[in-house]
Swiss-Prot record:
Chain ranges for the short sequence motif Nuclear export signal as given in the UniProt record: 12-21, 85-94
Purpose of the protein: Mediates the nuclear export of encapsidated genomic RNAs (ribonucleoproteins, RNPs). Acts as an adapter between viral RNPs complexes and the nuclear export machinery of the cell. Possesses no intrinsic RNA-binding activity, but includes a C-terminal M1-binding domain. This domain is believed to allow recognition of RNPs bound to the protein M1.
Other facts: Average number present in a viral particle is estimated to be 130-200 molecules.
Keywords from the UniProt entry: Host nucleus, Host-virus interaction, Transport, Virion
Name of this protein: Nuclear export protein
Family: Belongs to the influenza viruses NEP family.
GO cellular component: extracellular region; host cell nucleus; virion component
Subunit structure: Interacts with protein M1. May interact with host nucleoporin RAB/HRB and exportin XPO1/CRM1.
InterPro entries, sorted: Flu_NS2
HAMAP family: INFV_NEP
GO biological process, one term: exit of virus from host cell nucleus through nuclear pore
Stretch forming the signal peptide: none
One Pfam assignment: Flu_NS2
Length: 121
């Protein structure tokens, strides 16, 4: 795992949590939950790739991993759209910076998951 990506996840989640406390927006809750879920999925895929011996057990244990992978890409696309929308409508510089970092992180993680998944195929 890239330590920068892990710290980026933690930073984004912390920033979004602060934003959530300052606003009554319920949709930030969903975004935070999705980010946490995405982080866990990315980490588990990365671990499976690092232990290539687990590749076959991963595939045998969970025949639906390709379907799950597709769902994660859908979640990433949804998050990217949500973050872009938030970025367009916000005027607060703290929020703009947070959403710009979140967008960059999502694009980076999408690429990492693609790389992991190609290694698992």
């Amino acid at each position: 795992m890239d330590p920068n990506t892990v710290s980026s996840f933690q930073d984004i989640l912390l920033r979004m949590s602060k934003m959530q406390l300052e606003s009554s927006s319920g949709d930030l809750n969903g975004m935070i939950t999705q980010f946490e879920s995405l982080k866990l999925y990315r980490d588990s895929l990365g671990e499976a790739v690092m232990r290539m011996g687990d590749l076959h057990s991963l595939q045998n244990r969970n025949e639906k991993w390709r379907e799950q992978l597709g769902q994660k890409f859908e979640e990433i696309r949804w998050l990217i759209e949500e973050v872009r929308h938030k970025l367009k409508i916000t005027e607060n510089s703290f929020e703009q910076i947070t959403f710009m970092q979140a967008l960059h992180l999502l694009l980076e993680v999408e690429q990492e998951i693609r790389t992991f998944s190609f290694q698992l195929i």
